[in-house]
Amino acid sequence: MVEFVKICGVKTMDELRLVERYADATGVVVNSRSKRKVPLKTAAELIEMAEIPIYLVSTMKTFPEWANAVEKTGAEYIQVHSDMHPKAVNRLKDEYGVSVMKAFMVPRESDDPAEDAERLLELIGQYEVDKILLDTGVGSGRRHDYRVSAIIAKEYPIVLAGGLTPENVGEAIRWVKPAGVDVSSGVERNGVKDRVLIEAFMAVVRNG
């Protein structure tokens, strides 16, 4: 059963208020190539006003970069989409008390799901984080090989991301059996979070 739903990539107060009505958490993207990225100042404003956990999402790789972003935004939750060293992640947790979701990239198509899962499990084991996200790539809007994710989900309570939509999230949940799901472009219309799509997505997740 899915216990955690995150709707990521809010850019405005209107989007934040909409997402808050449905999701358990949201996210704001900074210092990234994503089309949903916002300035740190905007991120700080959204974080201050958020009534649900809001993750600071980025591809930043170093402790100084993350420390600066956390200090400027007041973030209590961060989502790391890079190969940041485990010791640097632990230092962020220790010095800033942030809750960390670490993203791990799953191949779009795997020639050997068991081998790819084993490689990722070994990598995941090096990190001490609060949530594990399996994704295709930050904000890629593309699905990955669920055969790999399903193996990992038997070992860890994972959050599943990557190309999820109201039409395919039910199948994804049945296949992978994740503890949580993370969606962004799948609930947008013309680049903006859409209430109808969010409601359709949530109906499948909660009742499917």
From Swiss-Prot:
Pathway: Amino-acid biosynthesis; L-tryptophan biosynthesis; L-tryptophan from chorismate: step 3/5
Source domain of life: Archaea
Keyword Amino-acid biosynthesis recorded: yes
An example Gene Ontology biological process: L-tryptophan biosynthetic process
Keywords recorded for this protein, A-Z: Amino-acid biosynthesis, Aromatic amino acid biosynthesis, Isomerase, Tryptophan biosynthesis
Keyword Hydrolase among UniProt keywords: no
EC number(s) on file: 5.3.1.24
SUPFAM superfamilies on file: Ribulose-phoshate binding barrel
InterPro entries found in the cross-reference section: Aldolase_TIM (IPR013785), PRAI_dom (IPR001240), RibuloseP-bd_barrel (IPR011060), TrpF_fam (IPR044643)
Molecular function GO terms recorded: phosphoribosylanthranilate isomerase activity
Catalysed reactions listed for this entry: N-(5-phospho-beta-D-ribosyl)anthranilate = 1-(2-carboxyphenylamino)-1-deoxy-D-ribulose 5-phosphate
Family, as annotated: Belongs to the TrpF family.
PANTHER family: N-(5'-PHOSPHORIBOSYL)ANTHRANILATE ISOMERASE
Name of the protein: N-(5'-phosphoribosyl)anthranilate isomerase
Organism the protein comes from: Thermococcus kodakarensis (strain ATCC BAA-918 / JCM 12380 / KOD1) (Pyrococcus kodakaraensis (strain KOD1))
